[in-house]
């Protein structure tokens, strides 16, 4: 506590980021301040060299302050830099008392470039700095379904480089294009098609009506499989914005953010209004054992969404709640990012308040659907048994696979919201010579990626205590707070023992070892995670081995024997690198002419 007292006396008045740590050097909280000394001192009350929490702060903050053993600060040029650095560090290090919003992706837009002779609809996530470009969006989902539908319903130029070919392609043969490349349609005639395309993008009902007519024609012609494709596409497009019944007389362009939380769960809803209509929406479920701070959640949501330059900015950003101080900070952040003033406000009356109420109603509805399930109970029991500080809402599970230390690969699977998130799975080619160095490489590469993809609550390692300790060391060096458990087979005579009809599994934590009955739900939950990572790694290993066998066969056809292939692989590292290497480079490795 003496170190903390000394730090409080020697704080800078500069802008910067502060980090609080407990006695075990675990990161508790990251914050930012225009004046570090003033902000940090607001957490504490100091009398007679005794430090206690400031009673004016929330119970959540007071609970955190009681655990603070020391602090660190990072000085920056100004408050804007502090705001951006704070957000980046929270995502990378995942402090115990900060809220982590994972949805920081940039949503796609559909655009048409009318400066070209024959404009076509395309998808982008970036600003195209040229005149004549018209944007639509953002689309939280369904953008590709809209695009595919437009190309199938209208005789548009089907590919960006079609006009350059100067020759009609198969799309002209099947009447999906008018072949402007051969001047079979004038620019003026094509412009009418492009304008019809615009109308369908702007009016989802018109697009759906055309799709329904096509689906009906296919069905009448007994082309049921194709009709089903259109049925599914219609369903996806209808889900793009469940609030399309809202159509304001005023042509507002608004982004709307609503946060609703209770206990250890919360929901953030985002709605995007263009031309007085809600065109898309999204939500994110958030969990925290330490409660929520609306200011912190809103700050992270706004920075995540607007830190990349977006093609279309709203006239105004509406929030359901936020302190005046944070509102001002965010206003300055937006103005600085986009070099223009875009108002952020908390509506108190009128149709904008009605929009916030609709967003809140949806947040509350989504929240109410998040009922406690058997899986929640198992997670809570697992947390209690393994003495985890956080609920394992998001879990990353790791396994490696190899054959005689060749074709070494690793896999990471992700489990969140009670299901495997296959879009988040990752595969790795590894160079390690044994299972320990391979696991170390796999986990190190994942930890190095924390800045881009925030860490989870829990790592599950397929391995024993050695692999567990490897994981703990890597996480310690990364500075991120992630808890770890490992699962391994029981060993007899230093070998993994597998009994006929089922293997005996042991679960390892940093401080304990658990041998649970096969019927134990907590063991079964960990086994389910381990088995999926094992399946994923094994499948990747098999596909890698098959690919390598084919590439070896191709090299043999060129007169390169297995011993030479091994030399080349040892030197270049992969078959892809061998293919890219020049004959001279390969000759030098083999010391003979190939």
From Swiss-Prot:
Main location as per UniProt: cytoplasm
Keyword Nucleus attributed: no
Record's keyword terms, sorted: Cytoplasm, DNA damage, DNA excision, DNA repair, Excision nuclease, SOS response
InterPro entries: GIY-YIG_endonuc, GIY-YIG_endonuc_sf, GIY-YIG_UvrC_Cho, RuvA_2-like, UVR_dom, UVR_dom_sf, UvrABC_protein_C, UvrC
Subcellular location(s) of the protein: Cytoplasm
GO molecular function, one term: DNA binding
Biological processes annotated in GO: nucleotide-excision repair; SOS response
Domain UVR span(s) in chain numbering: 205-240
Pfam families cross-referenced by the UniProt entry: GIY-YIG, UVR, UvrC_RNaseH, UvrC_RNaseH_dom
Protein's job: The UvrABC repair system catalyzes the recognition and processing of DNA lesions. UvrC both incises the 5' and 3' sides of the lesion. The N-terminal half is responsible for the 3' incision and the C-terminal half is responsible for the 5' incision.
Name of this protein: UvrABC system protein C
Family listed: Belongs to the UvrC family.
GO CC annotation, single: excinuclease repair complex
Gene: uvrC
Organism the protein comes from: Helicobacter pylori (strain Shi470)
CDD domains: GIY-YIG_UvrC_Cho (cd10434)
Sequence ranges assigned to domain GIY-YIG in this UniProt record: 13-99
Source species, domain of life: Bacteria
Subunit and partners: Interacts with UvrB in an incision complex.
PANTHER family registered for this protein in UniProt: UVRABC SYSTEM PROTEIN C, UVRC/OXIDOREDUCTASE
Keyword DNA repair: yes
SMART domains (alphabetical): GIYc
């Amino acid at each position: 506590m003496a170190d903390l007292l000394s730090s409080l006396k020697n704080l800078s008045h500069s802008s910067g980021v502060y980090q609080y740590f407990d006695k075990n050097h675990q990161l508790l909280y990251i914050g930012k301040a225009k004046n570090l000394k003033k902000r940090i001192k607001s957490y504490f009350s100091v009398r007679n060299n005794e430090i206690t929490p400031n009673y004016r702060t929330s119970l959540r903050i007071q609970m955190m302050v009681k655990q603070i053993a020391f602090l660190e600060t990072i000085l920056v040029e100004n408050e804007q830099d502090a705001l951006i650095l704070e957000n980046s560090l929270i995502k990378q290090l995942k402090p115990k008392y900060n809220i982590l919003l994972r949805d920081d992706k940039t949503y796609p837009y559909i655009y048409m470039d009318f400066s070209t002779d024959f404009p076509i609809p395309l998808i982008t996530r970036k600003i195209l700095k040229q005149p004549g470009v018209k944007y639509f969006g953002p689309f939280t989902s369904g953008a590709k379904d809209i695009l595919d539908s437009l190309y199938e319903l209208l005789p548009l130029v089907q590919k960006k480089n079609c006009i350059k070919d100067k020759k009609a392609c198969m799309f002209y043969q099947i009447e999906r294009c008018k072949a402007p490349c051969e001047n079979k349609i004038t620019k003026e005639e094509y412009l009418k098609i492009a304008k019809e395309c615009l109308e369908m993008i702007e009016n989802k009902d018109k697009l759906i009506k055309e799709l329904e007519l096509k689906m009906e024609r296919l069905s009448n012609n007994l082309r049921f499989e194709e009709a089903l494709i259109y049925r599914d596409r219609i369903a996806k497009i209808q889900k793009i914005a469940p609030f399309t019944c809202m159509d304001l007389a005023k042509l507002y362009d608004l982004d709307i953010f609503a946060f609703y939380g209770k206990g250890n769960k919360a929901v953030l809803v985002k709605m995007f209004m263009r031309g007085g209509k809600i065109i898309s929406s999204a939500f994110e479920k958030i969990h925290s054992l330490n409660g929520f701070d609306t200011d912190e959640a809103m700050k992270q949501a706004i920075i995540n969404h607007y830190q990349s330059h977006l093609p279309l900015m709203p006239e105004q950003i509406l929030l359901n709640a936020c302190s005046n101080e944070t509102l001002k900070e965010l206003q300055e952040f937006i103005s600085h990012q986009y070099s223009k003033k875009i108002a952020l406000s908390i509506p108190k009356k009128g149709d904008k308040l009605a929009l916030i109420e609709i967003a809140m109603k949806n947040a509350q509805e989504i929240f109410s659907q998040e009922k406690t399930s058997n899986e929640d109970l198992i997670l809570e029991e697992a947390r209690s048994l393994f003495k985890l500080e956080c609920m394992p809402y998001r879990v990353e599970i790791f396994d490696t696979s190899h054959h005689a230390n060749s074709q070494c690969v690793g896999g990471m699977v992700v489990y969140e919201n009670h299901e495997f998130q296959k879009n988040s799975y990752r595969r790795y080619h590894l160079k390690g010579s044994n299972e320990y160095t391979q696991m170390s490489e796999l986990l190190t590469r994942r930890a190095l990626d924390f800045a881009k993809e925030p860490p989870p609550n829990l790592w599950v390692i397929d391995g024993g205590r050695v692999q567990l300790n490897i994981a703990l060391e890597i996480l310690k060096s990364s500075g991120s707070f992630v808890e770890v458990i490992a699962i391994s087979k029981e060993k007899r005579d230093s070998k993994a023992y597998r009994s006929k009809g089922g293997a005996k599994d042991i679960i390892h934590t940093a401080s304990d070892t658990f041998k649970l009955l096969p019927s134990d739900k907590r063991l079964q939950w960990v086994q389910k995670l381990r088995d999926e990572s094992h399946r994923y790694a094994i499948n990747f290993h098999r596909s890698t081995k098959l690919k390598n066998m084919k590439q070896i066969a191709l090299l043999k056809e060129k007169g390169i024997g297995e011993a030479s292939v091994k030399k080349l692989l040892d030197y270049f590292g992969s078959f892809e690198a061998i293919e890219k290497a020049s004959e001279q480079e390969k000759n030098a490795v083999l010391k003979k002419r190939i």
